[in-house]
């Protein structure tokens, strides 16, 4: 399975009236349903990124591992799926989320295999013998739990000479948890005490969940930081949260926008620790009218803020997408808007009745998409981040990346807000912003 598809931007053509909503520089297949990113890993001169993918919008179809590679985390090439369900095998109904590691120079995947009718997804492993383009047969490496609300999404890493595996879990009695296993050889695994546990807490509109999906473990400034996706049987996906596992958990949101879930970590990269995430649709299912849904976020460098929350910034190579200054009276669907400093309001006028408003105060950023779309199925609402700016950081007050229906805003203090917007009016659009604002068109 080494045949490649065309590069992402060449696969994003549409003759429909919503062509301007299709992201061009974010990772996504030309059609079908995409969700969780999986197993980013540097191998040779490239980074490999896998992701949950279905070839159509049929959510009952078995999940495959889509595959993309990049030399710089910005210019991506899509390939054929690297992993597909094995008929009659331990993943016959879906290859669900996990991660990858290097095992004697080969890429080894750990993931959840789904079989219809079984209460849990089994933790499986499979090896690639062709540089990550495809994976061989899978087998189970840890037993299914006796009882749990949920058990899935392994994350494997090496630390202090040993291999460790975190698995998302939850129980009725003890709440959400990260199950933990140890191995000397990636083959034989022994269960140890959970890495973290937390009874479900709900306050101020935030919910830590009754179980945790997609656990990731980073080491930042000598501290072990878990990144989890909160989940509950009645509510489904919640928020992406982070916390120090060596003190009583105090989860904090990783992204303060409306559309970010199922983060996937790369512990070590040329830019330090990184996170990717799934940017789900911000519109009801009847609005998925162009044959695709779901996008992978931009890769994010991460560090710890003064309050121990996880902060984010775009990778430096994002600058290579800049194709020249954009006129504020003729903004395209792919652009970067930069406010170097100060307060004010950034308004992207899509049409007479459609606009996206971003307000900057001394300490907060607010994104209001209440009037961003006249489409009946598009979501609205406002999102806010406090403690948003750090003038001493050397970073702009805010960098706003627009890619069709995707908006990702990064502030100087490392706050990030991701959302989706669906203007019915195609570009060119008009930008109203403070006088010092810079704007670039972005092109692959």
What do the predicted segments below correspond to?
Residues 414-428:
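Short, solvent-exposed beta-strand-to-loop segments that form ligand-recognition rims
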Residues 373-397:
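Short, aromatic/His-centered strand-loop micro-motif at the edge of beta-sheets
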Residues 319-375:
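Secretory/extracellular carbohydrate-interaction modules
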Residues 335, 395-411:
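Short tryptophan-centered beta-strand motifs in secreted/extracellular beta-sheet-rich domains
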Residues 426-444:
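Ligand-recognition surfaces built from glycine- and aromatic
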Residues 1-153, 158-207, 219-257, 270, ...:
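Beta-rich carbohydrate-recognition and catalytic domains
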Residues 143, 251-253, 326-329, 384-391, ...:
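Beta-strand-rich interaction surfaces with strong enrichment in secreted/lumenal proteins
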Residues 215, 259-264:
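Repeated scaffold domains used in trafficking and secretory/extracellular systems
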